[in-house]
């Protein structure tokens, strides 16, 4: 059995009180927080609870002050401004969204002037990307691929204007930021083999002991340790290699995995470890020691708050819950077909879909499948309190994913004792073994449609069965 991050919750000791640890924030910088972001939040919380000083390695930096302004201000004032800029970028991804919208303006019928204006905007955006890329490469070679970054302390986060924002609730657990501009772009360039070596982060001047990457990266470190450098890479899955529609290019992702395997590494499931070792033709040594199971994503405070909420978004029937960003590999179309083919809706049940629906072909197909079916509730994005309420009140949870590195929503449901219907994947089997006390955990073969329909029909009798027990 692997190690669970939940072990830290019950620890009264502080064995990491002398350690200063940097954690990559690449997933927390994204506009949409997905599974890896929740793993990162759990890791931050666990390390902090065990006494470590935690710093986020970020590509964000201060942008309101130019060098001349900084020279005329005190160091503390500059750090205060830069820290506020970094916090704002973590809190508000709207700038990124606005740029995307600008790029889409040319899709609409417009007059000639507007079309020309949009073409100029697109040209400017693309030119800026190219200029930034060239500048990053130039800077990389000027520094010989070695970066120190700036250590920016975050003190009294509770007294900042950003405290209380759900998106950054993890910031109360960190001590500050390590800001290295374009560090993840450089790592990406190395994974595509456009750079002759991986960017190296020198942790010695920052007095940091360890770097943990929350996903495989082409990156190296230098520390005060006698070893060549302490970097622990957390590896989730092989999905970009096994699923063609994944946005990551398989060559770049393969190289990221290859580079990560050269350092110390851990996996979030035994299934992921075995598959990745097989693909990279590596032997799986220390199988049990190299697995760290994630925490459930449901926050205890949010669960307590949600338990006091009587109703949500007009939901007034029993429902089956699906919780995930709507992506092809999550197989929501399969679940909708099962729901519509079963008799459970005739017995007063709805299907609630909680997760962002993207403006792509798959998202549009899902909307078309549901547009004439009032029994299917497409809730789109839900906040953490809403998500907690949906799990607390769900009659059952369903996850028909085609491929998963782990499956945190399945863990969330099973941990609360919610009946689970999940695709029979190796990672889902591991979750079933972790929550053996949940006797209503069903693993179903995706090729057996009749079995899925039958299990859906049986859900309506679940309450009666539980009462008999």
Show which residues each predicted segment covers.
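Carbohydrate transferase catalytic cores enriched for Leloir-type hexosyltransferases
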Residues: 2-469
